[in-house]
């Protein structure tokens, strides 16, 4: 399962990149707005050292303008993936991008039906929002399983990019259910390393190492 970071914070991205564990980045207008920087500048800087997919979202809601914005975003770097909302106008844009060989990430997916429509339009990635579904009383993890089964039934190549991942259990479960990729905030990434037995075990090793002769 590929690991993406859901952030526009350059320091966070560099920390994970230096570990050799980073496969890509997802961003959205809300995340980039927090940086206080120009949208395209942030994407360009990320792409300068992250060579995997970097999702950058269009801001329009009509297909012609989405296509115009997406074409501009795709010029920033070869690894830019144009992020498009899962609405009818978005599907028009996705089809147009697919015909031009431009990768897309269809976002705000909350049903398996939506995921199938996005795949038929030619989406490279589909982003089901696990945590947000949980928030309103639905099973976000079950959605991952449903999409995986449908895609496998028909040999669909669209990659499942699990999003809105809130904690390590989400991370583990989307992996078990066959997500191709997961995107998570830096805070959740840090949690993946944590376990009290790891901490206590390391403390014991460090203490015992003081008794060794090198």
UniProtKB/Swiss-Prot annotation:
One term of GO molecular function: transaldolase activity
Gene3D superfamilies: Aldolase class I (3.20.20.70)
Entry EC no(s): 2.2.1.2
Stated role: Transaldolase is important for the balance of metabolites in the pentose-phosphate pathway.
Listed Pfam families: TAL_FSA (PF00923)
Disulphide bridges: none
Enzyme class: transferase
Biological or metabolic pathway of the protein: Carbohydrate degradation; pentose phosphate pathway; D-glyceraldehyde 3-phosphate and beta-D-fructose 6-phosphate from D-ribose 5-phosphate and D-xylulose 5-phosphate (non-oxidative stage): step 2/3
Compartment list: Cytoplasm
Protein name, per record: Probable transaldolase
Family classification: Belongs to the transaldolase family. Type 3B subfamily.
UniProt xrefs under SUPFAM superfamilies: Aldolase
Active site: 83
Gene: tal
Primary residence: cytoplasm
One annotated GO biological process: pentose-phosphate shunt
Keywords carried by this UniProt record: Cytoplasm, Pentose shunt, Schiff base, Transferase
Record CDD domains: Transaldolase_FSA (cd00956)
Catalysis performed (reactions): D-sedoheptulose 7-phosphate + D-glyceraldehyde 3-phosphate = D-erythrose 4-phosphate + beta-D-fructose 6-phosphate
InterPro entries tied to this protein: Aldolase_TIM, TAL/FSA, Transaldolase_3B, Transaldolase_3B/F6P_aldolase, Transaldolase_AS, TSA/FSA_arc/bac
GO cellular component, one term: cytoplasm
């Amino acid at each position: 399962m590929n690991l993406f970071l859901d952030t526009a914070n350059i320091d966070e991205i560099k920390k994970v990149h230096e570990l050799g564990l980073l496969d890509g980045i997802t961003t959205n207008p809300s995340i980039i707005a927090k940086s206080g920087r120009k949208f395209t500048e942030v994407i360009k800087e990320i792409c300068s050292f992250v060579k995997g997919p970097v999702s950058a979202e269009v801001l329009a809601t009509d297909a012609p303008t989405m296509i115009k914005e997406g074409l501009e975003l795709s010029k920033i770097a070869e690894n830019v993936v144009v992020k498009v909302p899962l609405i009818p106008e978005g599907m028009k844009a996705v089809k147009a991008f697919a015909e031009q060989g431009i990768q897309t990430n269809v976002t705000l997916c909350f049903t398996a039906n939506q995921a199938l429509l996005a795949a038929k339009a030619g989406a490279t990635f589909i982003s089901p929002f696990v945590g947000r579904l949980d928030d309103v009383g639905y099973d976000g993890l079950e959605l991952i399983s449903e999409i995986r089964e449908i895609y496998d039934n028909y040999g669909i190549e669209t990659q499942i990019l699990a999003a809105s991942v809130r904690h390590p259990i989400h991370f583990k479960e989307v992996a078990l259910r066959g997500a191709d990729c997961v995107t998570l905030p830096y805070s959740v990434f840090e949690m993946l390393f944590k376990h009290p037995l790891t901490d206590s075990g390391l403390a014991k090793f460090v203490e015992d190492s003081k008794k060794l002769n090198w």
